Amino acid sequence: MIKESSSPALDADKIEVPSPKDENNSSNSEAATDNEDFEISDDDDDDRNHKHRKREARPQSFDENTEQSPGGPLKKRHKISGGADSHGEAQKDFFPKFKRRPGAGAHSRAPRVNPSFRDSSASVAARAPMTRGRGRNGAPWAQHEPRFNTLEMIDFASQMASQGPPTHPSLFMGPALPSGGSAQNGSWGPYGFMPGMPNGMLDPIHPLGMQGPIQPAISPLIDLGMPRQRCRDFEERGFCLRGDMCPMEHGLNRIVVEDMQSLSQFNLPVTVPNTQGLGIQNEPGTAPVNTSSLGGSKGVPAKDIKSAVTNDVLKLNGTTALAVSDADVYDPDQPLWNNEHPDASAGFAHTDGVWNAESLGYEAAREQGNQVLAADSSQNSKSSVWGRIASKKLGHGKTANATSTSATGNKRNESYDEMAPSTVHVNPASAKDSNGQSNSRIFGDVGRQSNRASHKASRTLYVNGIPLESNRWEALLSHFQKFGQVIDIYIPSNSEKAFVQFSKREEAEAALKAPDAVMGNRFIKLWWANRDRIPDEVEGRIPAKSSHMSAALANSVPQPSSSNRGKENLQSATPRASSGSSAEASGPGTGHKMLPANSVKSLPPDTKRQESLELLEELRKKQEILAQKRDEFRRQLEKLAKQKGLANSAKQAEAGGKEVASNDVHRVTDSKSMNTGTEGPRDAAGTLQNRTSGELASSSHKSSATSAQKPAVATKQTSPLLVPSQNRFKLDNRTTSFRILPPLPPEIADESVLKDHFMSFGELSSVVLEDTEAYNHDATLKPSLSCSACVTYTTRQSAEKAFIGGKSCKGHTLRFMWLTASPGSTNHSRFQKTSIPARASSFSSQTQNMPSESSTTVGKMSSTVKSSTTAKPHSESMPTATSAKTSVEIPKALSSRDSDVSQ
């Protein structure tokens, strides 16, 4: 049985600090009074509010062990509950009065991040005043949670990033732009979200709530250590069209292409207006950049931040803000470069107020690696994200540095090539080149820049980034000839670039716009070159450096139609006016015609092209006519040679049948036919060559009538039917002399008569009459019977003609014998074999002195050897050959004499 207390009230001085058990199990001092007691004084009300606010601020529970208040003895503890009923009533009134916030369970409080934070008076003083109901009054929405400071936020963010992606980008947002959002709309600022967050996690209610344009270069700088996702476009397609604006990770070896025209080979999309996306505004405007929020970010040097902010401010201000009005999304159905609008989009246009190379007087720098093509100006209603990169302002004190883009991303230290495209881009971060020298030479005169800008290439493409092993004209031709006729390919030695020129601009544009990778390599880029190697007014001129390449191109490129043939052949026929040598003009399947360069140089520019076309057409017609005449003349010569050989063979057979045996006649016929068959075509070929040379010389003389002197013509033989080579035949040591065997008729034994007779067959060298009386011991012989003649011509062909056709003179038939013969020849020895026995038989029929015949024959043979030696002293093989034939023929003569004697 519980004993009740005798007194309803106790002394307040005896109860100073209640125990935790009493505080939880028994009634409180506030619970002992009614509701009016709480409203007695403002002092009591402030004390209660402060007490309960402290309970919410620190972690506690309703367990047995409750944290003791550090403030000393409690106030107003002089009243104690009188019983359980009053305690229950007080508890019922107390909990509805001070109800906790929704969602805060009894055991759901998490420990504080920093337990000592509430005891730090400095932290409390530095903290901004907060009220209950944050987000529902006029306080800035981007104010930090007071329980977290900046350093703890960064550390905690890095811990959360390692555990997984956050559920919402509202965690630990950074400071936003002023007026970037309000508590009512709840839109997130452009700088608040973290780099690792996907861009789609924006407020779906107000996607266009930002009051300033996006800052593409600042968001990646706020790197709080959170890993970023790899860009899918960059990994799979090899390039990312967002460039620096993409929040994804692209790796360390990325290449940022700042010129837009180099990306024209891809189907680059344009933006679609009124589409919700990241960083889109409805009205153009600028916003200040809060650089103070970037100072505490990790891993970003201060000077890099300053440089990046400067660039971004330049891009935000001015006319480039208009390019951000459209949506930053891609439409594959509307490519950046299409057939309806072949020019570049409006994003490529240079604004005069922002960038004008001609008005500012900037010259494309002839520095190392200046091979970036300037974007062409055009008119288009669409704009793209590349418009933000196309126009840049020049900062004060900054110098323009022309940067080059290649397959490896490195600057190439090469000499400037005028054909390589170049432009000037602002690069404040790098005001010096790779050698540390200031790029102060980029400022040039306005005249040169405007002159170069007006003379851009219209049909020549600049190909860069070609691997050295693939940089061959065969590979380039196989790729670019799909788009049209390639008239010139120039490849600098030991380089990764090339220049390809087409016959028409449409073909070059088709090759530039083609989505296929060049030669199967997506790192090979195309631009317009600065100039055409073959100008329009003198189209077809080939420099001396690439003559070998152009000849190969002419063989591999298909032949055009007859209407365009003159125009296309001109590129290989008309030489450059500045060169000292002329090129060749190739006809369809015929030889080349030579055209001097000075004949075109003196003509005015307007009529130069027309005159060249007419001259080329005339040369082509002459070549065709000459080819037809040559073929016809060759057929006639062959036919005539056959007929002449047969007639001479029959005639010689009749003459030889009267003097020699039938078997010797066959040998003579065979030898004559063989000589006719071999020497006839040679003579015809010589005549043809003379005619061809004469016609070529006459045509060349006509074409060079306007020149002061004939230049040296670079001859390149492509057909054996042109001017004959001097070394066409081998060294000919065959004799050009033959002997007229005795007896000579009296009316013929005269040098003047013999010269008149043999001069019709060719150019005579000498005609010598020889008297053989010194060797003739028979005094009964007449002087004419012992006389012979030696006829010598300047050429072997003339001697053969006279040997065959000159045997009939004034009704008499003469007999000939070659004086010497080459060791390998058998044709001439046949004549000697047939002539000597005939001569011996004639001698034997005219004399009856047998013993003297032998000596006479030997004497005649010896005299023959001596005379031949004196007539042909330069032949080294003559004595050997003559002695050999003497030793062979003497027994035959003696044998023939013996046969006559026996008869």
From Swiss-Prot:
Zinc finger (C3H1-type) stretch: 225-253
Residue stretches of biased makeup (Polar residues): 432-441, 556-576, 826-886
InterPro entries for the chain: Nucleotide-bd_a/b_plait_sf, RBD_domain_sf, RBM26/27, RRM_dom, Znf_CCCH
GO molecular function, one term: DNA binding
Compositional bias (Basic and acidic residues): 11-24, 86-96
The keyword Electron transport belongs to this UniProt entry's keyword annotation: no
Signal peptide as annotated in the record: none
Residue runs in coiled coils: 608-649
Keywords assigned: Coiled coil, DNA-binding, Metal-binding, RNA-binding, Zinc, Zinc-finger
Region called Disordered, residue ranges: 1-144, 390-456, 545-609, 642-720, 826-903
Record bears the keyword Protein biosynthesis: no
Entry GO CC: nucleus
Compositionally skewed regions (Low complexity) per UniProt: 397-410, 577-587, 693-708
Residue span, RRM domain: 459-531
Official protein name in the record: Zinc finger CCCH domain-containing protein 27
Biased composition (Acidic residues): 33-46
